[in-house]
A protein has these predicted regions:
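Short C-terminal domain-edge/linker segments immediately following a structured domain
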Residues: 42-48, 86-92, 220-225
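Short secondary-structure transition/capping segments
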Residues: 57-66, 90-113, 232-240, 271-274
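Active-site loop segments of alpha/beta catalytic cores
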Residues: 1-36, 42, 53, 120-280
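Domain-level signal for soluble alpha/beta catalytic cores
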Residues: 1-5, 19, 27-32, 68-132, ...
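Glycine-rich, N-terminal phosphate-binding loop and its surrounding beta-alpha-beta segment
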Residues: 42-83
Length: 280
């Protein structure tokens, strides 16, 4: 009823909890990234004790996978050399992974930009992907595949396989504890995730300050990038049409639509318009 904007019999409670369940139940957020069985038990105890109406645990993140990838946009408890304490959630490190002159490349060839520029910058251990490219002339043999079997690319593929194995372990544990909680009467609050397209550019590509500056210096490119991010997300949500999910709700945090940093016209054009496109 509450989701449908009808008056419910009682107020539903399903707060976003972060590291709280682990810390209250004798575990830690570090365990949520490295010791899934311990973290799962903490989650079950927490939900049984406090009885919220739904779970907001969206899945375990693999600390080992992020170590292998040398992830640069977060720091996390358990990473060798980290200063993040075990009880803390991961910490975001905002960087510019795309400079202002690269909007045309992003818009013209999103996949190519991700392979050759974004992924090597955000995950340096797989920078062997940076040389992957295809030349369309004289496709009579395997020559166009050369960049895929270069030594650097093969090293990146081998490491990606190891990263995938670690992420698969996290996904398996996440699904197991989610099913267990559902059987106990705590269904998931969300079965998908997304962001306002402007926030995607600000969070993961240009950084907050650069994105706000781009409103003035590269408004057309920023608007086009936001529209593209809306389309990419809409395509990614098509599974909602077919998958037998217990609920069909998307976790959708809003980060950067701040009236102190954009005019009403800018908000309408580059924040609200692509966000509304995602919603409708």
């Amino acid at each position: 009823d509450a989701t449908a904007l009808r008056e419910p019999e009682r107020i539903p409670m399903c707060p976003m909890l972060g590291a709280l369940p682990y810390n209250l139940e004798g575990s830690s957020y570090r365990a949520a990234m490295y010791n899934y069985s311990e973290a799962s038990e903490a989650l079950v105890k927490f939900y049984q004790e406090f009885q919220p109406d739904a779970t907001t645990h969206t899945g375990f993140t693999s600390g080992k996978a992020n170590e292998l990838a040398q992830s640069t946009m977060i720091d996390w408890p358990g990473r060798p050399g980290t200063s993040v304490p075990d009880f803390s959630t991961h910490q975001v490190i905002e960087n510019e992974y795309m400079d202002e002159n690269e909007y045309p490349e992003l818009l013209k060839d999103f996949t190519g930009f991700m392979l050759r520029k974004y992924i090597p910058r955000a995950f340096p251990s797989v920078n062997g992907l940076a040389d992957i490219r295809f030349v369309p002339s004289i496709v009579l043999n395997t020559t166009p595949l050369a960049s895929l079997y270069s030594r650097q690319a093969q090293e990146a593929f081998s490491l990606l396989a190891k990263i995938g194995e670690e992420d698969a372990k996290a996904a398996e544990a996440s699904n197991a504890v989610s099913n267990r909680l559902a059987d106990l009467g705590f269904p998931p609050m969300f079965t998908g995730a997304g962001e306002a397209p402007f926030d995607i550019i600000g969070d993961y590509y240009r950084g907050t300050l650069a994105t706000l500056t781009d409103q003035l210096e590269y408004p057309e490119e920023l608007e086009a990038a936001c529209d593209m991010m809306a389309d990419i997300q809409i395509e990614s949500w098509q599974y909602f049409k077919y998958a037998p999910l217990p609920v069909k709700r998307v976790f959708f945090p809003l980060h950067k639509g701040m009236d102190g940093f954009m005019s009403a016209e800018q908000y309408e054009k580059i924040y609200w318009k692509p966000l509304k496109k995602c919603m409708l």
